[in-house]
Every structure is written in structure tokens, then in C-alpha cells.
Amino acid sequence: MGKNVVVLGTQWGDEGKGKIVDLLTEHATAVVRYQGGHNAGHTLVIDGEKTVLHLIPSGVLREGVQCLIGNGVVVAPDALLREIIKLEEKGIPVRERLRISPSCPLILSYHVALDQAREKARGEFKIGTTGRGIGPAYEDKVARRGLRIGDLFHRERFAAKLGELLDYHNFVLVNYYKEPAIDFQKTLDECMEYADMLKPLMLDVTAALHEMRRDGKDIMFEGAQGSLLDIDHGTYPYVTSSNTTAGGIATGSGFGPMYLDYILGITKAYTTRVGSGPFPTELFDDVGAFLAKRGHEFGATTGRARRCGWFDAVILRRAIEINSISGLCLTKLDVLDGLETINICIGYENEEGAVIDAPTDADSYLGLRPVYEEMPGWSESTLGAKTLEELPAAARAYIKRVEELVGAPIDIISTGPDRNETIVLRHPFG
């Protein structure tokens, strides 16, 4: 019987999911993306060579692994085709192994224009989106007016829907945001070109997944962003527009929760966040700068510098409950090498002095102060360690304390960017 494993982020994204998915796909028949879009940036380093993926599942670098994009993913055809071509230039036969649900909503030029116009209009109160049209595309989907990939293959139907959508969105762009209108004919011609290239990649992904399940194949589900960016469970409104938590798998791929065997939560050994929104343990001192520099904390998608802070056990406990996490993978442990002391946030203190748990929205974080537990750091290098015994005693104590505070086992420890720089204590497919 096959095993079905989920890999998802438990913080605000950028936890190192891509490397771990790539590592574990050695055992998988297929890797599935089920939410998000090309706002994701998954960085893989194999034998020193760096590859950044945005839409295509991280299993693409493993020979023979099928890569599936489920109906919950919003697809920008131009971005997808650029990514395919870039990988093909490296000799990877992407089109042989990539298949996409025709039910995926499309991201088109007017979504990007709306996204960027809104952020510009918000000024200092901007959400901090990637400006790639993700939110507006999900809005069209929920409003039941969006175009889907399957519409591309019916020109007359597509043109009629596109005309209605442009009438609606151009009115907002021109009259409210004072931005130029999107041209109908140019958009239609571009989309028809995309149709010819995308048609061979279409597949009923839900049916394919259940066929694999019945055949006893191992399947991996690859999450994008992080649990605290979930549209329902994140620090609203500073969130993404999809369900980044485990519940998104059922809706975004048609694969029910009863069939999931193991959910691996990825967490950094410290905390980072890109863009706006609450971040109780954020550091503005030399330690924050140290983490940013040592951790190369710049977004793979936007290039924006990430905000850095101490490990937050409070938000991780919340993510573990929401996702029913089976085990954790602790990444970037090596970034903490050289720190004399390390703090772990164990609670938040409000203005009355009471220690509380994680709030449910962004405004409720105002006035909260992190309560820290201090632990000794270590001077020895953990970079590239492959067994627990190779780690300094203080690093092992830090790992054990994190497990105790969050109530979940750490099954994998990442000690460097390469897929081989990993300690596996319990294998999700084992």
C-alpha cells in the first residue's frame, strides 16, 4: 500500500519546503501542487547548482517523478511557460512529466494590473503582495466569473467571457485607480497562443490521483507559502488568498483527508516574514542582521529582504493543531551557529501583563510583547551534519526544547541548502 505525504510550511512561508520536497521525492511517484500560484518561490540546491521554482512542483528535478498541478492553483500561462522553457534549457523534459488540471483559474494581465494598482493606492498600508495577480484571480474564482484553463480551448466561449471581464475590470482600473485599460484583442491573441502550448499538458488530476492511490503509489503534496498566511487561519488581512493549511489539499486537488498518511510541517530554527503584518519576535538589532545575512534571507520570488526574528513556539503550536502535523522538519539550524545565547518565544504578554496564546487576526497582535526563554548557543559548526550525534550538545538541547514546547517530534533536521545536508530521524514514507 502506498503512502500519501504532505509537506507544508508552518510559519509565514520561506521555511525551506522546496529542498525537503526534493529530498523526499526519491520515494514518490508524483508531486502535487494544490494551492497558490507563481507567488511561491521554492529554492532547490543539488550538487551546488541552484534552481528556483515558482509554479512547477519541486519533484521536477527527480527523474521519472510525475508533477501535477491541481485545481486549487491559480496559473499564469506566461509565467508557467517561461518556467518550462528555463528548465528545458537545463535538459529537464518537463512537458513529458507535467500535467495540469483544466479547472485551474487563470491569472491574466488585468489581474496583475489590479494587484499592483491596489498596492500602490494603499501606500504605507499595503498588504505586501508579490504584485503577480494572485489575489484578484482568486477573487474572480470566488465571484464565479473567473476564466479557467479549460476555457482556453473554446475560442468563442473564451472571447465572450473575456469581454465581459474586461468591461468590469477596466472600469475599475480606469475610473478608480486611474490606470490604463487592458486591451481585449491583445489579451485574446496571447491567450490563444497559450492554448496551443498548454493543451497537451491537460489532465483530470483528481482522477489521476485516485488511480495512483488504488494502485498503491506514493504521492506527495507540496504546499506553498506558510500556515500563518492562510486566508482563514493566518494573520488576516496580511495573508495570501488561498488555504495554505492541510485543508487546502482536499479542495485544491480533490484528494480527501482520509487518504493522507503523514503531514510534515516545515519550520525554520528562527522566524522570518516577507512584507507587512504582525511579527512579535522580529529583531531590529545586530542579531536580526546576523540572521538575515547568514540565512541569505531574500525572497526567491520578489528578491525582497525578509524580516528576521527569534523562533516563535506560540505560532508553531497553532500551526501544528490546524494542520494535524505528524512531525516537523527543522531547517536552517546552521544559521544559528556562533550565537552565544538563543531565545525562544513561549508566549505573548498583553498590556495588562497576562500571558496569552496566538491571536486570530492582525489587529489583536498590537501591544503584545514576546515572552522569551533563553538557551545557550553553540560555537561549533552544524553545517552539513548528517547525524544527530554530530551536532553540538547545545544544538541538541535546543532541538529537544523546541519539541517539548510545541508538542510535536522533529523528524528531520536540515543543516545546509544541499539535499544531502540533512539528518533524517524518522522518514515520512518509512
From Swiss-Prot:
Active site per database record: D14, H42
Keywords: Cytoplasm, GTP-binding, Ligase, Magnesium, Metal-binding, Nucleotide-binding, Purine biosynthesis
Pathway where this protein functions: Purine metabolism; AMP biosynthesis via de novo pathway; AMP from IMP: step 1/2
An example Gene Ontology biological process: IMP metabolic process
Residues bound to IMP: D14, E15, G16, K17, N39, A40, G41, H42, T130, R144, Q225, T240, R304
Molecular function via GO: adenylosuccinate synthase activity; GTP binding; magnesium ion binding
SMART domains associated with the record: Adenylsucc_synt
EC number: 6.3.4.4
Cofactor: Mg(2+)
Root EC class: ligase
Keyword S-adenosyl-L-methionine tagged: no
Catalytic activity entry: IMP + L-aspartate + GTP = N(6)-(1,2-dicarboxyethyl)-AMP + GDP + phosphate + 2 H(+)
Free-text comment on the cofactor: Binds 1 Mg(2+) ion per subunit.
One GO CC annotation: cytoplasm
Main location: cytoplasm
Binding site for GTP: 13-19, 41-43, 306, 332-334, 414-416
Record-listed Mg(2+) binding positions: D14, G41
Subcellular location: Cytoplasm
Protein family: Belongs to the adenylosuccinate synthetase family.
HAMAP family given in the database record: Adenylosucc_synth
Listed name of the protein: Adenylosuccinate synthetase
